Amino acid sequence: MTNIHTDKILILDFGAQYTQLIARRIREIGVYCEIWAWDHDPSEIAGFGAKGIILSGGPESTTSPGAPVAPQEVFDSGLPVFGICYGMQTLAAQLGGATEAADQREFGHAEVDVVAADALFSGLTDHAGASRLNVWMSHGDHVSQVPPGFTITATTDRIPVAAMSNEAKRWYGVQFHPEVTHTLQGQTLLRRFVVDVCGCQTLWTAANIIEDQIARVREQVGDDEVILGLSGGVDSSVVAALLHKAIGDKLTCVFVDTGLLRWQEGDQVMAMFAEHMGVKVIRVNAADRYFAKLEGVSDPEAKRKIIGNLFVEIFDEESNKLANAKWLAQGTIYPDVIESAGSKTGKAHVIKSHHNVGGLPEHMKLGLVEPLRELFKDEVRRLGVELGLPRTMVYRHPFPGPGLGVRILGEVKREYAELLAKADAIFIDELRKADLYDKTSQAFAVFLPVKSVGVVGDARAYEWVIALRAVETIDFMTAHWAHLPYDFLGTVSNRIINELRGVSRVVYDISGKPPATIEWE
């Protein structure tokens, strides 16, 4: 079997918003990589066995006291090193060059002039011209003097060093962001570093990952039984399909129907996994328990905790009935692992705690099986398609863990959840009919707990308000509201008001992120 982890790249993260994008681009090339904090234990960096190291961008200034630096072991390793943005600046500063703060930040599109050919830039062209490349900049500081042994390979009208290299040492740096699609030749630059300079084979493919994970799961669990909390979401669905392929009927899935799922989602999950794929699925109808626990609770964080804790409680009850189960499978994915890792210095902040990472009751003496923990979401989707799951399921828009519980503002009631699920289904149905679903990154309805005056027949009526939300985004860190056609919005509004008793008004959310978040709670 192919060892897909032999050739790998290590990315040291200095806190840039684009770091995960670097990793995703390298994975797309077909090479495995991991993201570690810049201050990770140097001995572990040496022991990782990378074929090359990338230094990411970051928000700090190399001119500030205590600015993050790459461990000296990186430069002593003899490995190729590629610094991006802040990564190039610290590369220069640490190796005897100089950096300085610019009078003003450079952010957005720029053109760089290639002035010397090296392994990355040789023969590279795009429509900006033979020696001019369209790139994406996002920086304040810049390199003012390259270190000894380095050559300037690219410049711009505003900065003297847009790229530099020391070919003898195989050290490279660029001030711009090759991982961003606006840098037209960015993927080619990354491929040249990873494949040509570092010598990595492109073994990281969906088929190879499935083969690798099946072997790992079989080795890990042996003849033991495994249980999985199946939510209907992409991650747990792909885990179910993968484990079923690996261990067959030794897998039992527990599907907790909270009453806060998408319209008819419970029936769809059972049809797909239990009936179509032959997976053992226990369905727990727990809506009554959820609505009882959520009664009178309006604080969003309190709702999240109640929903999460009750899921664990119910799952615990069901797992106790499965005496032979020794392993718990989870849909943890790589961003969960990164965000929960943090940094020993506190320079990299723990963004949030994840229900998939460290959220299990301590008395649950089950081993963990996490076959997706090395994968980004786009890779999980590709695996799902490779495993035979329907594209409509695998490429569905994101759905929050607490479900409709955080799309109902304020207190959650059964009648609100039923209205919202139906309104949401109408919105999604119309998006698909108009061929707009795949053109939006996320679209959903929100229940507003306010009554607005309307006219029903000849009478005034005070009824509920539904908000529609649709956004376009690449990474979900920033998002634009989707400019859906007025006629389309009118059709959706008419259907919701006409088909749902109790709704008299539909509004459309035109807030971007930032300042708004994508979800309302």
UniProtKB/Swiss-Prot annotation:
Residues 8-203 form the Glutamine amidotransferase type-1 domain. The active site is at C85 (nucleophile), H177, E179. One of its GO terms (cellular component) is cytosol. The keyword ATP-binding applies. It is an enzyme of class 6 (ligase). Its EC number is 6.3.5.2. ATP binds at S231, G232, G233, V234, D235, S236, S237. Pathway: Purine metabolism; GMP biosynthesis; GMP from XMP (L-Gln route): step 1/1. Gene3D superfamilies: 3.30.300.10, 3.40.50.880, HUPs (3.40.50.620). CDD domains: GATase1_GMP_Synthase, GMP_synthase_C. Coiled coil: none annotated. It catalyses: XMP + L-glutamine + ATP + H2O = GMP + L-glutamate + AMP + diphosphate + 2 H(+). GO terms for molecular function: ATP binding; GMP synthase activity. Keywords: ATP-binding, Glutamine amidotransferase, GMP biosynthesis, Ligase, Nucleotide-binding, Purine biosynthesis. SUPFAM superfamilies: Adenine nucleotide alpha hydrolases-like, Class I glutamine amidotransferase-like, GMP synthetase C-terminal dimerisation domain. Residues 204-396 form the GMPS ATP-PPase domain. Catalyzes the synthesis of GMP from XMP. NCBIfam families: guaA_Cterm, guaA_Nterm, PRK00074.1. Homodimer. This is GMP synthase [glutamine-hydrolyzing]. The lineage of its organism: Bacteria, Pseudomonadati, Pseudomonadota, Gammaproteobacteria, Lysobacterales. The gene is guaA.
